[in-house]
Design a protein with these regions (language model features):
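Hinge/capping helix and adjacent helix->loop/strand transition within the periplasmic-binding protein
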Residues: 1-56, 106, 116-151
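An extracytoplasmic/periplasmic, membrane-proximal ligand-sensing/linker region
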Residues: 45-48, 90, 129-190
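Periplasmic-binding protein-like
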Residues: 91-125
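Generic structural signal for alpha-helix termini and adjacent loop/cap motifs
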Residues: 16, 20, 68, 76, ...
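Ligand-binding pocket segment of bilobal, Venus flytrap-like solute-binding proteins
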Residues: 22-103
Length: 190
C-alpha cells in the first residue's frame, strides 16, 4: 500500500471494498499472473469486487502505486520499496515471511484463502529418475545454505523443498486450483 492509504490491515481493505464495490483498484504484473489469481480468489471467497489493473511487469505496477494511480499492489516487485519505506506492507499471499514477520498472510484474515507464488525446477520428459533425484538432492543442499537463505530472504522469498513426486502432486493441485479461479472469474487471456 501507499503509506498515505487509510488502510492498515487487510481487514481494512475488505471493509472498504464492501462499502465501495468496484472502486478499489489493485495492480499486478499482468493478466493471469499469480498475484492476479490470488486476488481473484480473495474476491471469490469474500464476495467483494475490486478492479484489476494489469501492468506489463511488476516495476510498472510499483511505480503506479508510488504515484497513487492505483490503490494497492499485489506483487513481489514491491519488496525493495517496502524495505526502503516507500510502501507499507498490509499482507502477503502466503504464510508470514521471515523478512516481514509482522506482516500477516491473507489467510489470517480471509478464512479458506490459501495461495502462494512458487518456482520449481523441471527436467525434460525422459530424464532418468536417477538424474532427477540427484538434481533434487543438489537443489535441497543449495537451498539449505545459510547465505542462499539470507539472499532469498532479502528478496522477500523463502526456500521450500520437496521430493520430485511431491512436486508433481503440487503441480496437479495448483493446475486444478488455477483452472477453477480462471473459470469462476471468466478470465480471458489475450
Amino acid at each position: 500500500m501507499n503509506p498515505k492509504s487509510p488502510s492498515n490491515s487487510f481487514e481494512d481493505i475488505l471493509k472498504r471494498a464492501q462499502a465501495q464495490p468496484g472502486k478499489l483498484t489493485y495492480g499486478t504484473s499482468g493478466i493471469g499472473s499469480p498475484s492476479h489469481m490470488a486476488m481473484e480468489l480473495v474476491q471469490s471467497i469474500t464476495k467483494t469486487e475490486l478492479v484489476h489493473v494489469p501492468f506489463k511487469g511488476g516495476a510498472q505496477a510499483v511505480t503506479a502505486l508510488i504515484g497513487e494511480q492505483i490503490d494497492m499492489l499485489v506483487d513481489g516487485a514491491a519488496f525493495g520499496q517496502i524495505k526502503g519505506g516507500r510502501l507499507k506492507p498490509i499482507a502477503v499471499t502466503g504464510p508470514r515471511l521471515p523478512a516481514l514477520p509482522d506482516t500477516p498472510g491473507i489467510g489470517e484474515t480471509v478464512r479458506g484463502f490459501e495461495f502462494t507464488n512458487w518456482w520449481g525446477f523441471l527436467a525434460p520428459v525422459g530424464t532418468p529418475v536417477e538424474a532427477i533425484n540427484r538434481l533434487n538432492d543438489e537443489f535441497k543442499q543449495i537451498a539449505a545454505l545459510p547465505d542462499i537463505r539470507e539472499r532469498l530472504s532479502g528478496l522477500g522469498l523463502a526456500a521450500r523443498t520437496s521430493t520430485p513426486q511431491q512436486f508433481v502432486d503440487h503441480l496437479q493441485i495448483e493446475t486444478e486450483k488455477i483452472g477453477r479461479i480462471v473459470k469462476a472469474a471468466n478470465i480471458k487471456f489475450e
